[in-house]
From Swiss-Prot:
Residues 30-49, 243-304 are annotated as: Interaction with DNA. Signal peptide: none annotated. Changing L336Q: Strongly decreases interaction with RAD51. Decreased interacting with RAD51 and ability to stimulate RAD51-mediated homologous recombination. Does not affect interaction with DMC1. This is RAD51-associated protein 1. Changing R333A: Strongly decreases interaction with RAD51. Structure-specific DNA-binding protein involved in DNA repair by promoting RAD51-mediated homologous recombination. Acts by stimulating D-Loop formation by RAD51: specifically enhances joint molecule formation through its structure-specific DNA interaction and its interaction with RAD51. Binds single-stranded DNA (ssDNA), double-stranded DNA (dsDNA) and secondary DNA structures, such as D-loop structures: has a strong preference for branched-DNA structures that are obligatory intermediates during joint molecule formation. Monomer; elongated monodisperse monomer. Interacts (via C-terminal region) with RAD51; the interaction is direct. Interacts (via SIM motif) with WDR48/UAF1; WDR48/UAF1 and RAD51AP1 cooperate together to stimulate RAD51-mediated homologous recombination (HR). Interacts (via WVPP motif) with DMC1; the interaction is direct. Interacts with PALB2. Interacts with RAD52. It comes from Homo sapiens. It is found in: Chromosome; Nucleus; Chromosome, Telomere. The modification Phosphothreonine is found at T66.
Amino acid sequence: MVRPVRHKKPVNYSQFDHSDSDDDFVSATVPLNKKSRTAPKELKQDKPKPNLNNLRKEEIPVQEKTPKKRLPEGTFSIPASAVPCTKMALDDKLYQRDLEVALALSVKELPTVTTNVQNSQDKSIEKHGSSKIETMNKSPHISNCSVASDYLDLDKITVEDDVGGVQGKRKAASKAAAQQRKILLEGSDGDSANDTEPDFAPGEDSEDDSDFCESEDNDEDFSMRKSKVKEIKKKEVKVKSPVEKKEKKSKSKCNALVTSVDSAPAAVKSESQSLPKKVSLSSDTTRKPLEIRSPSAESKKPKWVPPAASGGSRSSSSPLVVVSVKSPNQSLRLGLSRLARVKPLHPNATST
C-alpha cells in the first residue's frame, strides 16, 4: 500500500521579523475565520430589556380579538402558556373528565331502568290477574307459597295439581279407615266375650268416604268413631299382654326341657307334642304340669364332666385318668444358634 502524499503549507517566517520575543507570535490583525466574542455581548447590552407587564398587556388584546369557542358544560380551555408549567394538573383534569362522563352516562341510564321496572311491574300485575281468574274457574285452592309466586309461576303448578292432591287425601283417609276396621274385626273374633263388636262393617267404606269428603258434620262423626276405636284398641292390648307373657314363659320352659333331657328322647317327643295343645288353653292349666315335671327333669340331668377326662373315661372305668404328656423342648430346635446340639435326622446314613 502506498501512502498518499500530504499537502503541506509553507510557512513564511519573514513575517515575524526574526525577533526572539514571545510577543512576535501574537498577530496584530484577527483572522477572518474566527469570530470575536466581545462583539455580541456589546450588542446585547445595547438592546433594552422588555418588561413583563408590557408583554402581558400585549397578550390580552390578542386573546380578546380571537373569538371564544363555546365549550360543553363541565369542560374548560387550558392556555398554551400554562401547559408546560403544570404537568400534574393535566392528569387530574383528565381524571375529572372521566368522572363527568361516567356521571353523564349514569344519568342517561336511570330513566331507561325506571321504564323497564314499570314494564315488568305491569306484566306481573297482568300475570297475577290472569292466574287469579284461572284459579277461580278451576278450584278455590290457594297456594301455600308466600315467595314471589308471580315470577316463579308457582300458582300454575298448584292449580294443575289441585285435583290429584284432593283425590290422594281421600284415598289415604279411606285406606286408614279400612285398616282400622280390619284390626278391630280380628280382635273381636278372638276376644268376643270381653270386647264389644264395632258398630260399622267393611261394606260401609264407600259411604263413609263420601260423607267424610262432603260435609263437616260427617267429619265430626268420624272423629267420634276414631276415639271409640282407640278405646277398643287399648282394651285389646291390655287383654293380649298377659296372654302373650304366659305363652312366652311356657315356650321357654319347653326349650329348657328339650335341651336338658338327652337320655329319654321318646319322653321328650311326647311332652313336646302335648305342650302345644295345652298352650292354647288357659294359663292356669299350663303352669301345673310344667311344675310337676320340672323336678324329674332336674334329677335326670347328667353331671358335668371335664373335657380332658372325656377321652380317658371311654377307655377305662375311672372317670379321671391322668395322661402323660412329653415336653417338646428336647426335640425342637429353638432359634438358629450354632452352639445348640441337634440330633441327626438320619443316624443310619451317618454311621455307614
